[in-house]
C-alpha cells in the first residue's frame, strides 16, 4: 500500500482481531527484510513494515537521526489505530524501536531487538566506505556480518545514489539514551542474537542486560542477518515471544 510518499507493506490486509508486528529495517534496508518471515495466519497479520524515507519504495530523504525515523513511523501509523502491536527492529531498527517507546511514549505490546543493541557504534572503516557510496558500505557489512553463504544478499540494500547508508550509520553512531530510563519502561524487551554475529558488541549486550530487564535468545550458526540466514528459526522465536 502507498500514499504519495510512503510505502506500507502488508497494511492492506490488516485484521484487527489478530496480533500485529511492525518490523523496522536496519541501515540501508527496506521491506524486503521480511520476505521470508512466516507467522501463523490464524494468529498474526502478515509482517508489517514501513519503508523509511529514502529507503525502498518510500520517497523523501534519509536522515542521520534515529529520533527522526522514530517520529516518522509513529506519524505514519496514526491512521491505522493498531492495537496489540509489537515492535521488532533489526540492527538500526532496534534503536528506532527503543526510541519510539522511550522518547515518544509509543505503546507497544512487546519490543524485540534482532541483531541489535544499544549502544551501536560503527567502525571508522565502515563509515569511510559509506562516504564513498552505498555499495561499498553494503559489501563491508555483508563481508563481516554474514555467516551463512547467501546469494543475492547485496540486493537487500539500497541501490540509490544518495548516501543512505552513511546517514543511517551516522544515526546509529549519534544516538544517545540512558539505559536507566529504558529500565523503567513497562514493556517486555527481548533480544535475539546470532552466535556468529561480529557486528554486535557483546560487551554492550552484557551492559544492557545487566541494567535493563530483558530476555536474550541466541540463534546458532547465524550472523548479523538472521532474517535471511535462518528465517524459519527467527519466525519461531518471534512467535514464541509475541
Where are these regions (language model features)?
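Conserved HGGG/HGGXW glycine-rich cap/lid loop of the alpha/beta-hydrolase fold
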Residues: 9-59
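Conserved alpha/beta-hydrolase "nucleophile elbow" surrounding the catalytic nucleophile
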Residues: 25-27, 85, 89-91, 194
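Active-site loop/oxyanion-hole signature of alpha/beta-hydrolase fold enzymes
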Residues: 46-88, 236
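Flexible "cap/lid" loop of the alpha/beta hydrolase fold
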Residues: 95-138
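Conserved alpha/beta-hydrolase catalytic His-Asp/Glu region
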Residues: 125-184
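Short beta-strand/loop motif that positions the catalytic acidic residue
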Residues: 185, 191-193, 197
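Conserved alpha/beta-hydrolase "acid-adjacent" motif
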Residues: 198-204
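Catalytic histidine-centered segment of alpha/beta-hydrolase-like enzymes
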Residues: 222-235
Amino acid at each position: 500500500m502507498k500514499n504519495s510518499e510512503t510505502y506500507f507493506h502488508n497494511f492492506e490486509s490488516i485484521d484487527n482481531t489478530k496480533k500485529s508486528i511492525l518490523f523496522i529495517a536496519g541501515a540501508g534496508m527496506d521491506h524486503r527484510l521480511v520476505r521470508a518471515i512466516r507467522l501463523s495466519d490464524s494468529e498474526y497479520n502478515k509482517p508489517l513494515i514501513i519503508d523509511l524515507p529514502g529507503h525502498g519504495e518510500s520517497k523523501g530523504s534519509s536522515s542521520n537521526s534515529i529520533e527522526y525515523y522514530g517520529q516518522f513511523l509513529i506519524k505514519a501509523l496514526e491512521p491505522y489505530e493498531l492495537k496489540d502491536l509489537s515492535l521488532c527492529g533489526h540492527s538500526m531498527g532496534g534503536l528506532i524501536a527503543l526510541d519510539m517507546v522511550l522518547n515518544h511514549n509509543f505503546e507497544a505490546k512487546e519490543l524485540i531487538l534482532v541483531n541489535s543493541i544499544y549502544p551501536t557504534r560503527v567502525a571508522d572503516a565502515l563509515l569511510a566506505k559509506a562516504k564513498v557510496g552505498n555499495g561499498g558500505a553494503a559489501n563491508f557489512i555483508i563481508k563481516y556480518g554474514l555467516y551463512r553463504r547467501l546469494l543475492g544478499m547485496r540486493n537487500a540494500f539500497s541501490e540509490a545514489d544518495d548516501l543512505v547508508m552513511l546517514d543511517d550509520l551516522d544515526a546509529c553512531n549519534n544516538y544517545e539514551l540512558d539505559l536507566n530510563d529504558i529500565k523503567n519502561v513497562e514493556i517486555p524487551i527481548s533480544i535475539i542474537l546470532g552466535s556468529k554475529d561480529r557486528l554486535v558488541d557483546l560487551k554492550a549486550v552484557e551492559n544492557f542486560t545487566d541494567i535493563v530487564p530483558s530476555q536474550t535468545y541466541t540463534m546458532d550458526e547465524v550472523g548479523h542477518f538472521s532474517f535471511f540466514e535462518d528465517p524459519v528459526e527467527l519466525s519461531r522465536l518471534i512467535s514464541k515471544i509475541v
